[in-house]
Design a protein with these regions (language model features):
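Membrane-embedded alpha-helical bundles of polytopic integral membrane proteins
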Residues: 1-211
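Transmembrane alpha-helix interface/packing and boundary motifs in multi-pass membrane proteins
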Residues: 212-217
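Interfacial loop-to-transmembrane junctions
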Residues: 229-252
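Juxtamembrane boundary at the C-terminal end of a transmembrane helix
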Residues: 262-271
Length: 271
């Protein structure tokens, strides 16, 4: 617990500095590097893919996909990236079809393209018109949901939510996470409303963000938990003391970030 608190005390200021102060290109590069590390964790740390070239291709692809989000590039560039990536992966399979299985390529697609594209929503949100004002929304939702679920589960948890996938999660904890995320978004909306009087803030949409985001975060958490369960590992890495690896700390954001991006475009909380 002490390591977790110390790590959080360091990470939170760094997060605020990165998202609110640092130039957008620096934030994009740092996020892209973290996604590349997360790709390595999913492939190598799980033991599912140990072929060095496949891991290298996936890590480079993860970085490139994330940076594509920053440059707001044409879809044609993403298509070319995917084309080259696909060719490289299947070339590896053709050179050694006995050891390189289709399951390995499928995981390379998920870790090298799908996850970075979804998590790249953070970079795309930062690039929006009110990006500096709304970039913290995915983090607020994920943090409040995780914290609310933890403390509510600790205090009131009796009924298991997903005993096979994640035995420690409870229905009571999930409800606490939903409530905490909604309260957190109301507070965040109030801060924006008071801090930026010219900005129009929709409190109803803030509640919607909290509710939907918390549900998405819990699902994202379970997605990465089932991979750890199947591969028999406790953590994806040890990059962050007390928290594990990149995927251990930011697992819920895989679902929260793209959902928040979609909601910000379809039902803007701030104008």
């Amino acid at each position: 617990m002490k390591k977790r608190i110390v790590a959080a005390a360091v990470l939170i200021p760094l997060l605020l500095l990165l998202t609110l102060v640092a130039p957008e290109w620096i934030a994009a590069v740092v996020m892209s590097i973290l996604l590349s590390i997360g790709t390595y964790e999913m492939l190598y740390k799980t033991g599912l893919v140990r072929r060095s070239r496949l891991i290298l291709y996936a890590m480079v692809m993860a970085f490139a996909v994330a940076m594509w989000s920053y440059f707001d590039a044409m879809d044609a560039y993403l298509m070319l990236l995917l084309l080259v990536y696909t060719a490289l992966l299947f070339s590896e399979m053709m050179m050694d079809h006995v050891k390189v299985r289709i399951e390995m390529l499928a995981l390379c697609y998920v870790s090298g393209f799908v996850v970075p594209f979804l998590m790249g929503s953070l970079i795309r949100i930062l690039g929006m018109t009110n990006g500096r004002h709304v970039i913290l929304i995915p983090f607020v939702v994920a943090f409040m949901s995780d914290s609310g679920a933890y403390f509510a589960g600790l205090k009131f948890g009796k009924h298991k939510l997903a005993p096979v996938v994640s035995p420690n999660k409870t229905i009571e904890g999930a409800l606490g996470g939903l409530a905490a995320a909604m309260v957190g978004m109301l507070i965040y909306a109030l801060v924006l409303d008071l801090g930026f009087p010219r900005m129009q803030v929709n409190y109803g949409f803030a509640l919607l963000y909290g509710l939907c985001g918390a549900l998405a975060g819990m699902f994202g958490d379970l997605c990465f938990s089932i991979i750890k369960r199947q591969t028999g590992i406790k953590d994806y890495g040890n990059l962050i003391p007390g928290h594990g690896g990149v995927l251990d700390r930011f697992d819920s954001l895989m679902m929260v970030a793209p959902l928040m991006e979609a909601l910000l475009l379809l039902a803007p909380m701030v104008m």
